[in-house]
Amino acid sequence: MIDKTAFIHPSSIVEEGAIIGAGVYIGPFCIVGSQVEIGAGTELKSHVVVNGITKIGCDNQIYQFASIGEANQDLKYAGEPTRVEVGDRNRIRESVTIHRGTTQGGGVTKVGCDNLLMVNTHVAHDCVIGNRCILANNAALGGHVEIDDYAIIGGMTAIHQFCVIGAHVMVGGCSGITQDVPPFVIAQGNHATPFGINIEGLKRRGFDKESLHAIRSAYKLLYRSGRTLDEVKPEIAELAEQYPVVKAFNDFFARSTRGIIR
């Protein structure tokens, strides 16, 4: 079903069965598959391919040569009907690739809302990207990676499969991430190590002095006390009772499967 207010350039192919919302713009030389749904106001600039069982929300801007919903690169994948879901108001720049999920990983690759995926970003099968994240040029996510809200991933950074990147994290460019990065932390290097708290980013997002102090205290316990994670977890949990913002650390530890960067 194609809304009557949608524009489709004559050189583009929209297969029968695709759902195209109001005010959608599909520019020259695009291909949209039969199981694709594109929400109102989304723009495909030109030469965009959207394939597979893919749902794209409203008011997204998708630039030249982006590929969304194509078969993933997992060698176990045998054509199962897995999906891609993209939220609203994302900017997906040139040559970005977002691959469909696998049955082993839940069957869906997800991108939230208000994200910026810069040129050549790769989002592999079963990744989950939150809201208001920035992935700079040539950032590459392995399968099953989770990127929490407001995280910034520097250009040319590679993230190993199954890693979790916490909320408000900043990862410097050309880094290699092989373990999980706790919330609020700056990480840099190959292999990445912690470089303090993302103070400027937190200030811009309205964190008050008390919250910043509490986050610093948790960071010092985690990285400067000379103790193991299991040893400091109870103290961080106590700190979270007084300062709710610190609870983000506890929630993160519960999700972490690869250990945290050191």
Curated annotation (Swiss-Prot):
Top EC group: transferase
Alphabetic keyword roster: Acyltransferase, Cytoplasm, Lipid A biosynthesis, Lipid biosynthesis, Lipid metabolism, Repeat, Transferase
SUPFAM superfamilies listed in its UniProt record: Trimeric LpxA-like enzymes
Main location: cytoplasm
GO CC aspect terms: cytoplasm; membrane
GO molecular function, one term: acyl-[acyl-carrier-protein]-UDP-N-acetylglucosamine O-acyltransferase activity
GO biological process: lipid A biosynthetic process
Pathways per UniProt: Glycolipid biosynthesis; lipid IV(A) biosynthesis; lipid IV(A) from (3R)-3-hydroxytetradecanoyl-[acyl-carrier-protein] and UDP-N-acetyl-alpha-D-glucosamine: step 1/6
Subcellular localization: Cytoplasm
Superkingdom, natural source: Bacteria
Keyword Cytoplasm in annotation: yes
EC number: 2.3.1.129
Reactions accelerated catalytically: a (3R)-hydroxyacyl-[ACP] + UDP-N-acetyl-alpha-D-glucosamine = a UDP-3-O-[(3R)-3-hydroxyacyl]-N-acetyl-alpha-D-glucosamine + holo-[ACP]
PANTHER family given in the database record: ACYL-[ACYL-CARRIER-PROTEIN]--UDP-N-ACETYLGLUCOSAMINE O-ACYLTRANSFERASE, ACYL-[ACYL-CARRIER-PROTEIN]--UDP-N-ACETYLGLUCOSAMINE O-ACYLTRANSFERASE, MITOCHONDRIAL-RELATED
Subunit structure: Homotrimer.
Protein task: Involved in the biosynthesis of lipid A, a phosphorylated glycolipid that anchors the lipopolysaccharide to the outer membrane of the cell.
Family: Belongs to the transferase hexapeptide repeat family. LpxA subfamily.
HAMAP family with a match to the protein in the record: LpxA (MF_00387)
Protein name: Acyl-[acyl-carrier-protein]--UDP-N-acetylglucosamine O-acyltransferase
Species of origin: Yersinia pestis
